[in-house]
Amino acid sequence: MPTTQQLLRKGRTTLQKKSKVPALKGSPFRRGVCTVVKTTTPKKPNSALRKIARVRLSSGFEVTAYIPGEGHNLQEHSVVLIRGGRVKDLPGVRYHIVRGSLDTQGVKDRNKSRSKYGTKKPKAGAAAAGAKKK
């Protein structure tokens, strides 16, 4: 416990909050170039082949980012947009790739939660035709 004199001399220091997404440097998004695109397996007890990409950012960092949604068109040298947000069952993956921006296409044939996956609104005729098919 410090004395009153010590507090007058030095004062209390407030703890600085550590950023969960340091590579973004305070920005909501960052542009980057894919260096590696691959799949990896999640931690126990989950089982899958999760799609990830190693991305060199405009801020100079090289990070691992998750590719959300079913299917993607990314390959080496694709230019992508990165946002924060970790993947709970993939250690070390703290960023998400934004679907539907720059070189990343939106998820094909997606009708719900489209804005999260960069999918355009289907045409009224196409939606009716899709409903008739089923």
From Swiss-Prot:
3-methylthioaspartic acid: residues bearing it: 89
Ranges of Low complexity composition bias in the record: 124-134
Transmembrane segments: none
Domain of life: Bacteria
One of the record's GO molecular function terms: structural constituent of ribosome
Example of a GO biological process term: translation
Record-linked SUPFAM superfamilies: Nucleic acid-binding proteins
Disordered: region residues: 1-26, 103-134
Alphabetically ordered keywords of this record: Methylation, Ribonucleoprotein, Ribosomal protein, RNA-binding, rRNA-binding, tRNA-binding
InterPro entries: NA-bd_OB-fold, Ribosomal_uS12, Ribosomal_uS12_bac
Homology family: Belongs to the universal ribosomal protein uS12 family.
Subunit structure as annotated in this protein's UniProt entry: Part of the 30S ribosomal subunit. Contacts proteins S8 and S17. May interact with IF1 in the 30S initiation complex.
Protein name per its UniProtKB record: Small ribosomal subunit protein uS12
Species name: Deinococcus geothermalis (strain DSM 11300 / CIP 105573 / AG-3a)
Underlying gene: rpsL
